[in-house]
């Protein structure tokens, strides 16, 4: 497949295992993953990750919620390593756009990963903001859009077309829910998809005969029935 698979991660051991096995082509992190992974020192964790992972991109997110403080944090994060992308949410919690900050950072040669994008208007704004020469990523939360009952495929496909005017801007399918999303993302033209470990583990099922899957499922039910000791007839 042409699409690059990135892993969501905040566990160093797991990240290094995937990196060393060549299972992924990049990594992303976010505050929620840090909390779940028990990270207590953001800078120390990032520096340790970057000491081992040097030749694929790793995205680290700013923590501030106002544009001025975001800029200070972003410029600091950008100094950590050449393969770092700075994750910038497209809006603050107050709904203030970060497009001008993205424009400034990108123009200064800082690689940004603009995240939490959900609408066509946000895509338009951020594609316009990123620099033509500086590599950038726009992360579109296809899975969370699907969670609202809306098919994300048309939005993703149209967004890829919009981003094509900036040759160094890559579109990332975020919040992946199923293995088939990898194929859907590639069909839409996305250059990157982030995939959680639970779904990466399912790649071993690719190409399996559906009949064999059916048998395995029935055998699993039978095993659970035996373990429960249930009976219908006396």
Describe the role of every protein-language-model region.
Residues 2-16, 20-24, 28-108, 142-145:
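Active-site beta->alpha loop and helix N-cap motifs at the rims of alpha/beta catalytic domains
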Residues 35, 44, 122, 202-203:
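Flexible domain-boundary/linker segments
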Residues 96, 103, 110-201, 207-229:
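Catalytic alpha/beta core domains of metabolic enzymes, predominantly
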Residues 232-234:
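C-terminal extensions of enzymes
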């Amino acid at each position: 497949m042409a699409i690059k698979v990135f892993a969501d991660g905040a566990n160093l051991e797991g990240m290094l295992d995937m990196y060393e096995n060549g299972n992924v082509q990049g990594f992303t992190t976010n505050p929620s993953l840090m909390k779940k992974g028990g990270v207590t020192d953001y800078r120390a964790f990032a520096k340790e990750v970057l000491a081992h992972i040097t030749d694929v991109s790793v995205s680290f997110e700013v923590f501030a919620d106002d544009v001025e403080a975001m800029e200070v944090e972003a410029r600091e994060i950008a100094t950590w390593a050449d393969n770092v992308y700075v994750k910038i949410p497209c809006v603050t919690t107050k709904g203030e756009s970060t497009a001008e900050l993205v424009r400034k950072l990108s123009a200064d040669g800082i690689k940004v990963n603009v995240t939490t994008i959900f609408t066509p208007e946000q895509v338009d704004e951020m594609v316009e903001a990123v620099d033509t020469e500086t590599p950038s990523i726009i992360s579109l939360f296809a899975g969370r859009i699907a969670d609202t009952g809306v098919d994300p495929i048309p939005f993703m496909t149209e967004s890829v077309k919009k981003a094509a005017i900036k040759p160094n801007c890559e579109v990332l399918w975020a919040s992946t829910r199923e293995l088939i999303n990898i194929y859907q993302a590639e069909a839409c033209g996305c250059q990157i998809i982030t995939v959680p470990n639970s779904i990466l583990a399912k790649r071993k099922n690719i190409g399996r005969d559906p009949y064999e899957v059916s048998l395995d499922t029935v055998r699993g039910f039978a095993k659970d029935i035996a373990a429960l000791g249930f009976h219908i007839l006396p």
